[in-house]
């Protein structure tokens, strides 16, 4: 059993809920699975939570880091508590500086997260490398809070854009910072259905690479979405290389009339086909073959 699971089991031994770390076979592959059984019915995803306040640097601040491939995590909340202050008075009194503080870092290929919460402010989810499937997850933050070079689908996830008590220190934020580096790089973030809401005005994304790729499909976008939608950041001049698109989205934030002029206007039918779960990340049916229990 990987040491990661042993460590988490010890960490959560006094929490509400029960952590199970399982090794299950799927064909000739071992699927490492973390399952949290909730105590009682109707208590939701936040019954069992891992917390940490790391913030020294992005690559060492993560509350939960997953390196191996074939990981499945269910029913777990992961929070980086740095930046999550209880009052602005406290923040002002401490001359508080918002810093990158990662809740989860994912390096392994073929990793899946179901019914999980990820809470932070800046750099909440480091979707680093590999193919990943997030389903029915809650993701909270304000600045680049889903970032990296992963090849991932976020299915039916709720994105909450908020800086909490530090709201006055964040004029506007960014949901994604995707780092696709070349035209042949398969990475990208696809948001399938789900919703975006909150209290902090946010861009849907800013470029973390010259071929950055983020697509929202049939997502409910609230008025917190900045009218321009997208930002080139350090990659001005590469706008025609980005793939930023919104397909059949709805809600007050889906108004395209003031979007940046270089946003992609992709054909709905072909976009939904190209960036479907089966075509984008599950060509070999690793998701379809994840053990259900």
UniProtKB/Swiss-Prot annotation:
Major place of residence: secreted
Gene3D superfamilies per record: Single-stranded right-handed beta-helix, Pectin lyase-like
Tissues where the protein occurs: Expressed in siliques.
PANTHER family: ACYL-COA THIOESTER HYDROLASE YBHC-RELATED (PTHR31321), PECTINESTERASE 52-RELATED (PTHR31321:SF120)
Site (Transition state stabilizer): 122
Signal keyword on record: yes
Name of protein: Putative pectinesterase 52
KW tRNA processing (keyword) present: no
Family classification: Belongs to the pectinesterase family.
Pathway the protein takes part in: Glycan metabolism; pectin degradation; 2-dehydro-3-deoxy-D-gluconate from pectin: step 1/5
Subcellular localization, as worded in the UniProt entry: Secreted, Cell wall
Swiss-Prot/TrEMBL keywords: Aspartyl esterase, Cell wall, Cell wall biogenesis/degradation, Glycoprotein, Hydrolase, Secreted, Signal
Protein's GO biological process: cell wall modification; pectin catabolic process
GO molecular function, one term: pectinesterase activity
Organism: Arabidopsis thaliana (Mouse-ear cress)
């Amino acid at each position: 059993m990987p040491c990661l699971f042993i460590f988490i089991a010890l960490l959560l031994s006094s929490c509400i809920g029960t952590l199970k770390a399982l090794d299950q076979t799927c064909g000739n592959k071992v699927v490492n699975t973390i399952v949290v059984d909730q105590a009682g019915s109707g208590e939701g995803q936040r019954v069992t939570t891992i917390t940490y306040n790391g913030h020294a640097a992005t690559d060492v601040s993560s509350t939960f880091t997953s390196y191996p491939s074939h990981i499945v995590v269910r029913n777990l909340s992961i929070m980086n508590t740095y930046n999550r202050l209880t009052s602005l008075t406290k923040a002002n009194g401490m001359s508080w500086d918002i810093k990158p503080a990662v809740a989860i870092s994912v390096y392994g290929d073929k990793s899946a997260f179901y019914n999980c919460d990820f809470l932070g402010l800046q750099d909440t989810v480091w979707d680093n490398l590999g193919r990943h499937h997030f389903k029915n997850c809650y993701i909270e933050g304000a600045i680049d809070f889903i970032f990296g070079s992963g090849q991932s689908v976020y299915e039916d996830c709720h994105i909450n854009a908020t800086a909490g008590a530090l709201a006055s220190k964040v004029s506007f934020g960014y949901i994604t910072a995707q780092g696709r580096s070349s035209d042949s790089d398969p990475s990208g973030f696809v948001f399938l259905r789900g919703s975006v809401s909150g209290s902090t005005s946010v861009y849907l994304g800013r470029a973390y690479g010259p071929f950055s790729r983020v697509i929202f499909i049939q997502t409910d976008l609230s008025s917190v979405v900045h009218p321009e939608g997208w930002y080139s950041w350090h990659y001005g001049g590469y706008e025609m290389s980005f793939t930023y698109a919104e397909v059949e989205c709805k809600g007050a934030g889906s108004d395209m009339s003031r979007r940046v002029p270089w946003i992609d206007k992709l054909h709905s039918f072909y976009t939904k086909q190209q960036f479907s779960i089966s075509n984008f990340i599950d060509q070999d049916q690793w998701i379809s073959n994840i053990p259900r229990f």
